Regions:
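Solvent-exposed soluble domains appended to multi-pass membrane proteins
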Residues: 1-204
Length: 204
């Protein structure tokens, strides 16, 4: 339950693209807003205080409110797999990475250098504050890979090995928004390698 003194913000449900029959939808949306208000207030407090130049704040989350049909449209299904990752700090710029898919495995590779920690992190992804190389290595290419056998690049999302399942997901899809066979081949190999790694680690 939200605090009794919390001032709820009016909701324009005409903007909601999913189903609206669930009784918990509106309470979830208010909780979502409340959590963001608290985080925003905390960040503003730090940024206006004496520690602003020596403090790094990172936040991520997984908001279940997305499960209320908001991804019923094929072009919005990537929201099933999308969570926020926000970093506040002096003079931080993410450049071209802002439009590229990333995953939780990229977080520590991004945060450690900012904290002065050098060296590779186990099973790390890429540093999201550096530009993507012209030829990124397949293990750390700017794509998302999910245990369900789905993959996502900057243009769209698809089921591995199924070109017909490709759906454009970018807010402003480029004219070249189409299935990329090379991305699919690399991610099928990466999926198999990660599956093998997990099974070996668990001695299955």
């Amino acid at each position: 339950d939200l605090p009794a003194d919390y001032q709820k913000v009016p909701l324009d449900m005409s903007q909601w693209k999913g189903e609206t029959s669930e009784a918990t939808l509106v309470p979830n949306l208010h909780t979502y807003r409340y959590a963001h208000d608290l985080l925003g207030a905390f960040v503003q407090q730090v940024q206006s205080g004496p520690l602003k130049d020596t403090t790094l704040i990172a936040a991520t989350g997984d908001h279940n409110v997305r499960s209320f049909g908001v991804y019923a449209e094929p072009s919005r299904r990537y929201l099933m797999r999308q969570v926020p990752f926000v970093i506040w700090g002096p003079q931080l710029r993410c450049g071209q990475q802002l439009t590229q898919p990333a995953s939780h495995r990229d977080m520590f590779n991004t945060l450690f250098p900012l904290a002065g920690i050098e060296g590779n992190y186990i099973n790390a992804g890429r540093n999201l504050l550096k530009d993507v190389p012209a030829q990124p290595d397949p293990m750390n290419a700017p794509r998302g890979l999910f245990f369900t056998g789905e993959a996502r690049n900057a243009h769209g999302m698809w089921q591995l090995g199924n070109p017909k399942s490709f759906v454009c997901t970018a807010a402003r899809p480029p004219q070249s928004c189409e299935f990329n066979a090379q991305d699919d081949l690399q991610d099928r190999a990466r999926y198999a390698l990660l599956d093998w790694n997990v099974r070996i680690s668990l001695q299955k």
